[in-house]
Amino acid sequence: MQQPLTPVEAAAIILKACQELGAQIYFDEDVFVQTLRGSNTHPVRFFNLKTLRCFGALSELKAKQLLDGILWLIEDGYIDRVEEDRPLLLVAPNAFERIKTADLAEFASILGMWKKNE
């Protein structure tokens, strides 16, 4: 049986997905995410990380673990928190420029593990 992803691994997958979508992500206590493109007033889709097929690797993680991983990325400057009262997270424009080559290799292995769970 495969081990659940660590909070940092989960956050890395989310960050990678956000880069591909060019998206902002909202986290609430139920781990629902709203992705937005272009404008805060035009939502693209809602999905739940626990049930969405392509995020199956995250199914055993609790909301707190995901948020811990996201907060780790905020603290390291990979994601900007742009609202305090509601945890709206915006991928920083320079986030991927700041990730080291070793981190990118780790991303690739994490994403490989994620795809095996599809």
Where are the language model's segments positioned?
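Accessory DNA-binding and partner-docking regions appended to nucleic-acid-acting proteins
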Residues: 1-118
